[in-house]
Amino acid sequence: MDQYSILGRIGEGAHGIVFKAKHIETGETVALKKVALRRLEDGIPNQALREIKALQEIEDNQYVVKLKDVFPHGTGFVLVFEYMLSDLSEVIRNSQRPLTASQVKSYMMMLLKGVAFCHENSIMHRDLKPANLLISSTGHLKIADFGLARLFSNEGDRLYSHQVATRWYRAPELLYGARKYDEGVDLWAVGCIFGELLNNSPLFPGENDIEQLCCVLRVLGTPNQKVWPEITELPDYNKITFKENPPIPLEEIVPDTSPQAVDLLKKFLVYPSKQRISARQALLHPYFFTDPLPAHHSELPIPQRGGKHSRQRMQPPHEFTVDRPLHESVVDPSLIQKHAMSCS
């Protein structure tokens, strides 16, 4: 930590506190994510390891936040990221007026390029939401927070946790307890983000898992085997029943938007995961090639971070004093690299 000067605190999450800092020698501004270990014998948290592994796999992409360095510090370690000014949730929340059609197209294009790159590198993010889409001082959007990311294969026989993704952006198969799923969970989240950009408010703001499922069913209609053949195979399918409910036309859910936008939204928000449009296919949709065209990044709003950060605040396991010098770490640097490459 001696090579960095701490400029302030950005926020905190389940496994770390994030600080704005400046590299003393180069003057570069970065974000430092300090991950503390609850107990040394527990080892490095899986979410932190997944974040390191995912970003190592992706390497350098202009639509994914860059991991610059990882080093041990005290009873934990520090991830060094490029510094980003704000996030998309701040853009939505602080907009004095709804985003223009061209601004929405620009954000969606950057998001889809990042998601396409992740999926083409066999990485599911599993927690796409506006707060995890960071915005630079030049208006560029980059995907961040890979703590729930996993490598996937097309064989489809691997089991994953269904307790992933923030509730409002959680795919219906996850709400029904699916343990076998694919990158379609990210594509559902992209659709939810798209709808939120169009409406300036969340599409499915459920307060608990059951209400979340009700929000989805209210719009898309009650699923059956005709529209979703795999639904009866989902673990929680028989645990709760819903009355028959016809779908509401998406034109009524996102009024005052173009037919092309509604058509693309429909292609994300479908029950069968395999039927959701891929990120790469979505980039070729007529929506992006009809007027108004996507805005230049210089035309996008650049919000300042507010006093309260939009990420969920959680109590850190140990207090971390940035001013206290720690010349030796109890975490072996080689273990970070070793575990990161083996974690999946």
Swiss-Prot record:
Its EC number is 2.7.11.22. Keywords: ATP-binding, Cell cycle, Cell division, Cell projection, Cilium, Cytoplasm, Developmental protein, Kinase, Nucleotide-binding, Nucleus, Serine/threonine-protein kinase, Transferase. The active site is at 127 (proton acceptor). Pfam families: Pkinase. GO terms for cellular component: cilium; cytoplasm; nucleus. CDD domains: STKc_CCRK (cd07832). It catalyses: L-seryl-[protein] + ATP = O-phospho-L-seryl-[protein] + ADP + H(+); L-threonyl-[protein] + ATP = O-phospho-L-threonyl-[protein] + ADP + H(+). Residues 4-288 form the Protein kinase domain. It is found in: Nucleus; Cytoplasm; Cell projection, Cilium. It comes from the Eukaryota. InterPro entries: CDK, CDK20-like_STKc, Kinase-like_dom_sf, Prot_kinase_dom, Protein_kinase_ATP_BS, Ser/Thr_kinase_AS. Disruption phenotype: Fish lacking cdk20 are viable during embryogenesis and early larval stages, but exhibit curvature of the body axis and curled cilia in distal kidney tubules. ATP binds at residues 10-18, 33. GO terms for biological process: cell division; cilium assembly. It is an enzyme of class 2 (transferase). Coiled coil: none annotated. Its main location: nucleus. PROSITE patterns: PROTEIN_KINASE_ATP (PS00107), PROTEIN_KINASE_DOM (PS50011), PROTEIN_KINASE_ST (PS00108). Belongs to the protein kinase superfamily. CMGC Ser/Thr protein kinase family. CDC2/CDKX subfamily. Monomer. Interacts with tbc1d32. This is Cyclin-dependent kinase 20. The gene is cdk20.
